[in-house]
A protein has these predicted regions:
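Hydrophobic core segments of alpha-helical transmembrane domains in multi-pass membrane transport
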Residues: 5-17, 39-44, 76-78, 121, ...
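Membrane-embedded alpha-helical segments in integral membrane proteins
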Residues: 10-21, 132-142
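Hydrophobic alpha-helical transmembrane segments
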Residues: 5-6, 33-34, 67-75, 89, ...
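Alpha-helical transmembrane segments and, especially, the helix-loop junctions at the ends
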Residues: 81-91, 111-142, 164-170
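Membrane-embedded alpha-helical segments and adjacent helix-loop junctions characteristic
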Residues: 19, 23-107
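Juxtamembrane and boundary regions of transmembrane helices in multi-pass small-molecule transporters
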Residues: 108-111, 115, 147-177
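Membrane-interfacial loop-to-transmembrane alpha-helix junctions, especially the N-terminal start
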Residues: 1-5, 110-111
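Interfacial loop-to-helix junctions that mark the boundaries of transmembrane helices
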Residues: 2, 21-32, 146-156
């Protein structure tokens, strides 16, 4: 609720900065909004029918430490963001992560884990041209071949991923789930 209220207030303020006109309708990309709504409905449906509970239970059977659990959750967003964008990866996997953390009795770690997942999604998405809109724009602007793009971005994405694993290992250590 708080985020919605703040967003609405900021939207109203922006109307005074850029007065509403006929162009406002063109700012809304209905197809994108429809796709995101459909994705959120699917994720909500998965949650309601217990898919997250089933997969989460299996995940918790496989990992024995918080470090392993968090690395797995962050890796989900890291790798999926390379192909489905960072935003879609987060919309898809954050509800799953929250459900798993609750099942593990670790809900107090939710903000930290979601923050690490967000970093992971951004680090993963920077590797590929389709990982985020900025990369698509840069690739189109420069006409750079995909393999060249990957070659340029791989050291940065790889280094950031290693640093993320180090942070997770230090913060969570070998604490049992």
């Amino acid at each position: 609720e708080t985020i919605l209220i703040v967003a609405a207030i900021l939207a109203l303020i922006s109307c005074f900065i850029v007065p509403p006109d006929a162009d406002y309708k063109s700012y809304i990309h209905a197809s994108t909004i429809s796709q995101l709504i459909c994705l959120m409905i699917v994720v909500c449906g998965f949650q309601r029918i217990g898919v997250f509970r089933i997969i989460g239970s299996r995940l918790l059977e496989k990992v024995s430490t918080m470090r392993g659990l968090v690395i797995t959750l962050v890796a989900l967003t890291f790798f999926s963001a390379m192909f489905i964008t960072n935003d879609v990866a987060l919309v898809t996997f954050v509800p799953f992560a929250v459900a798993v953390l609750i099942m593990a009795g670790q809900e107090d770690k939710t903000i930290l884990v979601v923050t690490l997942m967000t970093i992971g999604a951004n680090v993963g998405s920077m590797l590929t041209p389709i990982g985020n809109a900025h990369n698509l724009y840069l690739k189109a602007l420069t006409g750079m071949p995909t393999m060249e793009f990957l070659g340029i971005m791989a050291p940065y994405s790889g280094t950031a991923a290693v640093l993320l694993v180090i942070v997770i290992s230090v913060v969570f250590g070998g604490k049992p789930v």
